[in-house]
Amino acid sequence: SKMDSSVRLLVLINPNNPCGSVAGAEEIEQLLSIARKWPNCMIVADEIYDGLDFTGTQRSVASLSTDVPVFTLNGVSKVYYAPGWRIGYLAIHDPTHRMLNVRDGIERMLRARLCASTPAQFGYLAGLESDRSWMLGYSEKVIRQRDVCIKRISQIEGLEVQSSGGAFYMFVRLTDAKWAEDDKQFVLDLLHEEHVLVVHGSGFSPKLGK
């Protein structure tokens, strides 16, 4: 209902940060059908958590699009657990060549030659081309940690949480009226009293994040 000709892009983070939800093929097709109605609209697909999909339903948006331009973002910081390498990439999928001007603008920016170190780039290439079965062990570890967190949080009165389908996040709802009144203060109290650091939900959405 909020779509009109002024909208230039739709953003999908899949698996999602901060909720940990995963959009499957059906949801992605719905998003594509919305973008398809507006010729000047493209999709930016942040898929940096694609290797941490616990549902088996995550799909690349570009692989499902036959006409809508999709700019896919990915990198090493999440799935490869190497944030210090500072390596990411953008893959452009533009079947009908509608975003040539945007692509040209990006290529002009690349000429500034600001990039990650060459050894790190070759290291990432080796990671992409070699056996990645080791990732399964890391994924299983994250799942075990998720399950422990869900079990413990569900035992605390005043907190609610849904099981995350991917990434390493969960969005905990404050159901206690006192806590929910000021989630920033809750975060500070939790840090000072229990030495546990979390992020306040209202930072993502003042209205929906509490």
Q: Model regions: which residues?
A:
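Hydrophobic residues in well-ordered beta-strands that form the structural core
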Residues: V11-L12, I43-A45, V198-H200
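Conserved core segment of the aminotransferase class I/II
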Residues: T66-I143, I150-R152
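Conserved PLP cofactor-binding pocket of PLP-dependent enzymes
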Residues: L52, S163-V172, D189-K210
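Short active-site alpha-helical segment characteristic of glycosyltransferases
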Residues: F186
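Generic structural signal for small/hydrophobic residues in well-ordered secondary structure
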Residues: L10, N17, D46, V70, ...
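Short, intrinsically disordered, charge-balanced linker/junction segments flanking boundaries
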Residues: S1-S5, R108, G158, V198, ...
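Active-site pre-lysine segment of PLP-dependent enzymes
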Residues: S1-S6, P18-I43, E47-W85, P95-R98
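Conserved glycine-rich beta-strand-loop-beta hairpin in the small C-terminal domain of fold type I
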Residues: Q121, L125, E140-I150, V161-T175, ...
